[in-house]
């Protein structure tokens, strides 16, 4: 019995010997961020806490541009149940979103009757990526 106790104590001491203190760094959660909408107004993502968000990269000159129709349908069908779509236009995927914010807004409203929130054109990768994507 003494042998087992000593072995257990040795095991516990060994475990803590290999642990290293690590300073915890506060990481922002999704809902701690804000992002500008297509009209340059702030979208506080905290307003969506407790809801389901589909944050989707979009582009008007992309092979998937027709996805706007499906995204709008999803938004309309489920927004009253707490499901929201937020479109994030970016020109960082093969230059497929070259337009200005006003051109993007006009394109989305004219061609797809988009009513879900769309952000301003946003960098989503690289050094200048929006904090939400880091």
Where on the chain are the PLM-derived regions?
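Bacterial N-terminal signal peptides that target proteins for export
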Residues: 1-8
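Aromatic (phenylalanine/tyrosine) cluster motif
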Residues: 3, 16-19
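Bacterial N-terminal signal peptides
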Residues: 9-17
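N-terminal "domain-start" segment that seeds a small globular fold
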Residues: 22-46, 131-134
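Amphipathic alpha-helical repeat scaffolds
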Residues: 37, 57-61
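Local sequence-structure signature of Cys/Sec-based thiol-disulfide redox active-site neighborhoods
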Residues: 49-54
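Short hydrophobic beta-strand elements that form part
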Residues: 56-57, 87
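Structural microenvironment flanking redox-active thiols in thiol-disulfide oxidoreductases
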Residues: 64-130
């Amino acid at each position: 019995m003494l042998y087992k106790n000593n072995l257990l104590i040795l095991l516990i001491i060994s475990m803590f010997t290999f642990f290293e203190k690590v300073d915890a760094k506060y990481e922002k959660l999704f809902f701690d961020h804000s992002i500008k909408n297509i009209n340059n107004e702030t979208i506080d993502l905290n307003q969506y806490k407790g809801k389901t968000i589909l944050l989707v990269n979009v582009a008007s000159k992309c092979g998937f541009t027709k996805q706007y129709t499906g995204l709008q349908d999803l938004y309309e069908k489920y927004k009253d149940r707490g499901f929201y779509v937020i479109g994030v236009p970016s020109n960082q995927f093969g230059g497929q979103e070259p337009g200005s914010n006003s051109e993007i807004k006009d394109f989305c409203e004219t061609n797809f009757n988009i009513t879900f929130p769309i952000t301003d054109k946003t960098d989503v990768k690289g050094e200048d990526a929006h904090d939400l994507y880091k």
